Amino acid sequence: MLKNLFYICLLLLFCNKSEAQNLSSIIDSCHYYLEKQDAMSFNKTYIRILDAYEKEYDAELYSIEEELKEMRIEDQSIRLLLLDASKKKQNVNKIRRIMDDIDRRNAVRVAEIIDQYGWLSPDDIGYEANEALFLCIQHSQDSLIQNKYLPILKEAVRDGAAKGWQYAFLTDRCLMNQGQKQIYGTQRITRDGVDYLVPLQDIDKVDSLRKEIGLEPLSEYMKDCGLKTGWSKEFYKNNIKQHESIFNSWFQSFKRNKNSY
């Protein structure tokens, strides 16, 4: 409790009474509840101080954070809907078209944000908004956008503004969308309800590369993806021609769809 009071006092020292009326009213309420010994109301109120402070004193970043959080909700919600539609075999193409529109719009906006502010860290905008930067670039169908921001993401990882696994996923996605073999084994293709790994550059080195970037072994990843049958390096090596054929077919379809936009 004393620690909370200390932070409240700090905010009071730095806040101008002519500004931040909302913040000021929240702080006044905290003092009122303390005097009334209303611990429940105090606990519900003091945790609103940081949000109010950011909204009033970092209004620009606060607005960006809220916008990115909304884009993250869009990005993930439409994918959950597509997953359900695929299971039910209902409205899949309609939902996919909606998802593509969302992805294009979000990628363009996130590109604008990164160009203006750089790759904002969780300390700048919170974890959800920070994740939205990655998701919207990752899910873009525009290879130019993905390739442009891949080195920026790499720098963000180095600076602690993004996660290593995000760099691995975007690296593999960029390669996949160019018809090339992936490095980290993060990308899969689903055909008739069966997952196939996009061909790898080096199956024997993939686990050590994944470990360097903070990812679990590939066999564990494939298991977590919900494969009904076991997966192993030997399985992959024995079926590499099938994986390559399925990937080549996917890539040709991807190029046709891309050219139709």
Show where each model-derived region lies.
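Stable alpha-helical elements in mature extracytoplasmic
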Residues: 26, 106-109, 149, 202-209
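Betabetaalpha-Me/HNH-type nuclease active-site subdomain
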Residues: 181-210, 221-224
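Bacterial Sec-dependent N-terminal signal peptides
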Residues: 1-26, 261
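Extended amphipathic alpha-helical interaction segments
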Residues: 112-123, 129-187
